[in-house]
Amino acid sequence: QAADAAAEVVDYVGGPSGLPSTGLTYYDNDAEMNALQNGSNPPEIIWRSTKKADEIDDEKNNFPPSLYGSGRTNPTQNLVDAFPDAKGYPITDARSEYDESNPYANRDPRLAKYIIYNGATAGVDNKVIKTGSSSGDDGIGRREASTRTGYYMKKMLRMTANCNPSNTS
């Protein structure tokens, strides 16, 4: 039923070519995000809030500790597993290219846009984030602000935000 409903939406907008080309990368584009502050109201946005260009509270609350964040929002394994492979097959499907020994390779590109997982890069310097239990401050349960699931939220956070208290820019 969900697939049928999604197909109806795609048909309604004129097929795949009618979908916005920036849908996957919208949150990566600071200019588009900053335009929201100035009254931009793109049709792709169905839920929004306003944020000033220099406001980094969301990043401070949700970045991993190594990026000077509090790591408050931790996606679950169930959410990560809901992202299909790059061809759209569920990771449990026999046709899937999912590989348990390399679980983040060949996945729907939204996974890397929405979730910080072990080995993903994040932050203004594209720091590699290690979330394993024997990893540094970003590892599972290593600090009070460390992930409790092995993942950190990435969607809606600006990777250009610098939360380092000694940052002067």
Predicted regions and their residues:
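An aromatic- and glycine-enriched ligand-binding surface/loop that stacks and positions planar moieties
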Residues: 1-135
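Active-site beta-strand/loop architecture of penicillin-binding DD-peptidases
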Residues: 129-168
